[in-house]
């Protein structure tokens, strides 16, 4: 299989550099039959050390997106107008837990308890636009059985993980979370 991400190298490097950024080709090594995924793309990854919670990562992502959108509007106004691109204004990005998202969806949502299906993502983004006037929304606290083994389980409820997805206009555009930083805890989760 092709590597999807140098995840562990980045996590190791954080011990020395505090923040590690990478822009590189990503090759998906998973089966999927959807127009919502591509097998190869250029990805931007970052790891942060010495955080208190996944909300620190979400705040960093919000600030980064805000900067990029403002930069695009300032330096590429002609191109954006030519393409008739609608660049969103980013204030604070709202968040809901997966459980809250499922409650918002009610009977209209999918039966998948571990994740959101594409139609769920569209509906949650419509909710975010209507309720918060935001094109973006974070969905947090997925079941701990879903994310990769390096995602930290919630201290309040170990059945959940400190993991999030960022949705934008009906699509998941990023995912992230708080990593396990305790050696024994990591070993225990790997062996579970």
List PLM regions with ranges.
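Beta-sheet entry/capping signal
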Residues: 1, 18-20, 135-138, 172
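Extended C-terminal subregions enriched in glycine
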Residues: 169-192
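Hydrophobic (often cysteine-bearing) scaffold residues that line and stabilize catalytic clefts
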Residues: 57-61, 97, 182
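Metal-assisted phosphate- and nucleotidyl-transfer catalytic regions
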Residues: 63-169, 191-192
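Short conserved micro-motifs at the rims of enzyme active sites and ligand-binding pockets
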Residues: 13-15, 33-36, 55-58, 149-152, ...
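A generic structural motif
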Residues: 45-56, 170-172
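Class II aminoacyl-tRNA synthetase-like tRNA-binding/catalytic domains
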Residues: 1-49
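Conserved hydrophobic/aromatic pocket- or pore-lining residues that grip, position, or stack substrates
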Residues: 2, 46, 101, 139, ...
């Amino acid at each position: 299989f092709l590597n999807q991400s140098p995840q562990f190298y980045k996590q190791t490097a954080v011990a020395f550099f505090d923040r590690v950024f990478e822009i590189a080709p990503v090759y998906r090594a998973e089966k999927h039959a959807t127009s919502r995924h591509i097998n190869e793309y250029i990805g931007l990854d970052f790891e942060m050390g010495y955080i208190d919670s996944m909300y620190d990562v979400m705040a960093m992502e919000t600030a980064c997106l805000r900067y990029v959108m403002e930069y695009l509007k300032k330096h590429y106004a002609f191109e954006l107008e030519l393409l008739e691109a609608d660049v969103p204004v980013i204030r604070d990005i709202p968040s809901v837990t997966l459980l809250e998202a499922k409650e918002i969806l009610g009977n209209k949502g999918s039966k998948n308890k571990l994740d959101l299906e594409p139609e769920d993502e569209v509906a949650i983004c419509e909710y975010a636009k209507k309720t918060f006037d935001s094109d973006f929304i974070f969905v947090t606290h997925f079941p701990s059985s879903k994310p990769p083994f390096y995602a930290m389980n919630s201290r309040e409820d170990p059945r959940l993980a400190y993991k999030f997805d960022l949705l934008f206009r009906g699509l998941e555009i990023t995912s992230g979370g708080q990593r396990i930083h305790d050696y024994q805890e990591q070993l225990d989760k790997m062996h579970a």
